[in-house]
Each structure stands twice: as C-alpha cells, then as structure tokens.
C-alpha cells in the first residue's frame, strides 16, 4: 500500500519540509477555526500554546495545521503509539505466560523443595488468577509445600520500577513495570453504605493474611466529590489502614485503592491466604530469585490476549499496562533483562521502517505518557493515526480508543454531531488528544491537538471546539 505523506502548512508557506519529506497538500487551513479562537480567548489561553493537525483520511489531505511541527509533550495520548506498535510487533493474539516450577521431589502430595513463580510480563495477573493457579496445584495433588516460593522477575530489568512523576508513590497509576506483577501490588478497600444503620461496611481485596481493617465506618452528610478527604484515610501502614473521618451519606458504594511497596510481603500474604483456602499447607516465605536450571515445569498460566490489553490500556488510560506493552516490544529479541532502552530501539525502528517517521520526531520514554521526556509533533501523530487506520489491526486499535460521550476517558464529552474515537492526555500544564473523527458527512479525519502552559488544564472546551469543527465537515 502506498505510504501517505504528511506535511504541516505554516501561516505563510505551502509545501514545506515535514518529517523529512516534501509533498503538496491541497485545502489546508493555516488559520484556526473561529470557534476555536473564541474558546482560546474565553479561557485566556494564548493561541501559540496550541498545536494541532487534522488530516482527511479519505483524501489524504491536511485540512488544518497549526504549529504542527512544534515538539510537544503528548502525555497519555502517546499510548496510541505504544498500542499500535505492540499490535504490529507482537500481534493481537499474543499472550504473556506465568510459569510454575519446582526444584524438589513430590511424594504423596508433598513437595519437598521450592516452588518457583516465574513472571512472564503479564500486567494483569490478578487475584482471580492466583486463586485459579493455586487450585490447579491442589487439583494436581499438592497437599503441602515444604520450601519457599521463589519469584523470578528477571524477564524485565529491575531498574524499571520508576519514581513517581508527582511524588505519589502510593497511587496505582505510578506503579513501575514488574515481570512478576501481581494484582497491581494494590489493596482495594470497598465501602458499602447502610443508610438505616448509619454505617458503611468495609472489606478488602485481594484475600490476604495479616491485614487488619475496621469492619465499619460511620456515615455523615457531605459532598460526594469530596468523599476521600472526608474519610481521612491513612494507608501508611498497608496492613492496618485507618479511617479517622466519616463516609459520605447518599453516595453509594465506593472503592479506595493503594499500592503496597513491599512486593514480596504483599505476594507472600496473598499466597498464604490462597494456599490456606485451598487446603495446601505452606509455611515458607516469598523471596526474589532466579529459576534454577534443574527446576521442572508444573504448568503455565496464560494472560488475556494482547488485543484485550490494548483495549484496557486505551479505554482507561492504564499506565502499567502501557509500560508492560512497551517493554514487551523487545521480547522477540531479548529473553531476559528487558529495559526501556531495548523497547525504545524497537519502537524507533518501527516508526522509521513502517510508519515512515524520521528518527527522534516521536520519542517514547516509557510507553505510558506519564513522562515529560516523551516528545511528539502534531504532524507526526496524525501520520501514526493515518498509518494505523490502514493497518491489518486497525479495528482492534481504533475500537480501543474511548468513544466521545459513551465510555472511558471521553464518557462525559459528547459530540453534537458525528462521532469520535479519541485518546486524551493530561499532565500538569499539558492537555492533549489524538484519534479519529467521523464527520456528519461520513468522512474520517485523524486529529492530534495539544495545549501546553498556563491554563492548559482548562482547555477541554478548546479541544472540543476542534472536534466539533471537524465533525461539521462535509
């Protein structure tokens, strides 16, 4: 298929160099639509803070270009690049495999030796999967394990546990990549209000030994939007979270999630609880290590397929899924110790060889967008969108984007006409969007837009004005 060439149109020039290629584009507007200008003015955002590029996918024409070659931080909209590269590099049916091995002898249901839990990079190995796999051990005849559980995380380099960009290390969105990640290293506390009794019932998942929770917290009047602050939760001790406030009356069930920093202790408590529930005696400990050469495989546990992970990554802007997808780009070339340098090399080759984007025009730092080191241009991002729209996996990819007014991060941003599959991005001082719009006349358009600087956080209306302008095209 002939490659489409993208070019930005400057205010005073037509047919300038973009992405290292020349091409004449017809019908491109180098001024902003009136409603977009009005929205910028109303929110006191300078027009120079905006970068936008819009391409008619049916005609391969740029219809709007404003600072389309300006390098900007994409925030989470870069996930569309990560997910498309993963679909094309690994395929939509790719699965991660978590391995269970042992290094001892098995006699009458007793394993005299260690059990190995070998991470295969599955970002969604959660409590239900551990329950299933422990019960698989039970079904295989295991009654007791005398040794330890050794967790092998060597598929990914240990350095991938990155520091939080905002200092909020206890928040799940800041979780670093881990080849043997379990349940996002998170505890989910559930609050179920009982209006008649004036209390909310409290419970926690996953099932763990040693965790202490109050059974209830009192209800009180308040604002639903401020339920967290009114609860006054303290999770500094992950085994004994406390709630010094009250739960807001009339707000329905809510969940509070926090990350446990000690991975081994978290997994140990989870294994202990699941082993006890399944009737397997185990009194050892969980420790990090490498699977020995003499270890024998018991079974492998397969993840969801990659297409499912892509959907969850984009619909809900899940950072840890994106990081695992990004690192997994290098798995066909490297069997262990995969790091972001390896992933960036694969990504850069794919962008150059497949998409036709010159080196360093798009820089992906960790795959998630939760980084100010990632850089893109509006023109390059619409080129990725145009390429992806022609990919054999275009359906899996585009359908993973949030739909305006319907789901994901675009649920509360409906379209007045037409429709949009749109991935958004947000960092302090940065707001972006990237996706596909189907206009009321039936044509499809690729769009990337970015706002940076003062009042960028107030820019939803500006980006929506761009979407509505595109949707009104014939």
Segments predicted by a language model, with ranges:
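Beta-lactamase-like hydrolase cores
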Residues: 26-71, 131, 136-140
């Amino acid at each position: 298929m002939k490659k489409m060439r993208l070019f930005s149109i400057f205010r005073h020039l037509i047919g300038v160099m973009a992405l290292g290629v020349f091409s004449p584009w017809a019908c491109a507007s180098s001024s902003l639509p009136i409603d977009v200008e009005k929205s910028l003015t109303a929110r006191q955002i300078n027009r120079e803070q905006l970068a936008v590029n819009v391409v008619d996918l049916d005609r391969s024409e740029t219809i709007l270009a404003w600072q389309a070659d300006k390098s900007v931080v994409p925030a989470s909209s870069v996930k569309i690049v990560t997910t498309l590269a993963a679909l094309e590099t690994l395929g939509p049916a790719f699965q991660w495999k978590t391995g269970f091995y042992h290094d001892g002898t098995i006699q009458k249901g007793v394993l005299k030796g260690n059990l190995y839990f070998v991470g295969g990079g599955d970002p969604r190995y959660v409590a239900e999967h551990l329950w299933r796999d422990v019960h698989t051990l039970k079904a295989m005849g295991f009654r007791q394990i005398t040794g330890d559980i050794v967790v092998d995380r060597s598929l990914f380099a240990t350095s991938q546990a990155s520091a939080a960009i905002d200092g909020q290390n206890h928040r799940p969105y800041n979780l670093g990549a881990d080849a043997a990640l379990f349940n996002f290293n998170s505890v989910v506390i559930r609050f179920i209000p009982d209006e008649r009794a004036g209390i909310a019932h409290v419970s926690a998942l996953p099932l763990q030994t040693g965790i202490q929770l109050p059974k209830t917290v009192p209800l009180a009047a308040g604002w639903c939007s401020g339920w967290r602050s009114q609860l006054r939760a303290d999770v500094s001790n992950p085994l004994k979270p406390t709630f010094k406030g009250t739960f807001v009356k009339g707000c329905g069930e809510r969940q509070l999630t926090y990350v446990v920093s000690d991975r081994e202790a978290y997994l140990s408590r989870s294994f202990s609880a699941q082993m006890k529930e399944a009737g397997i005696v185990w009194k050892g400990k969980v420790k990090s290590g490498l699977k020995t050469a003499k270890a024998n495989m018991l079974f492998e546990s397969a993840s969801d397929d990659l297409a499912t992970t892509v959907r969850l990554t984009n619909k809900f802007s899940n950072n840890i899924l994106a990081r695992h997808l990004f690192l997994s780009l290098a798995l066909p070339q490297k069997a262990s110790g995969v790091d972001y340098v390896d992933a960036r090399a694969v990504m850069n080759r794919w962008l150059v060889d497949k998409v036709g984007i010159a080196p360093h025009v798009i820089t992906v730092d960790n795959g998630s967008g939760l980084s100010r080191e990632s850089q893109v241009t509006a023109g390059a991002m619409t080129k990725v969108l145009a390429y992806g729209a022609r990919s054999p996996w275009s359906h899996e990819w585009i359908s993973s984007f949030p739909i305006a007014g319907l789901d994901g991060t675009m649920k509360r941003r409906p379209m007045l006409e037409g429709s949009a599959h749109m991935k958004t991005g947000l960092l302090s001082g940065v707001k972006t969007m990237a996706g596909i719009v189907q206009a009321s006349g039936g044509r499809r358009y690729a769009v990337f837009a970015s706002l940076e600087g003062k009042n960028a956080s107030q820019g939803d209306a500006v980006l929506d004005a761009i979407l509505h302008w595109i949707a009104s095209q014939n």
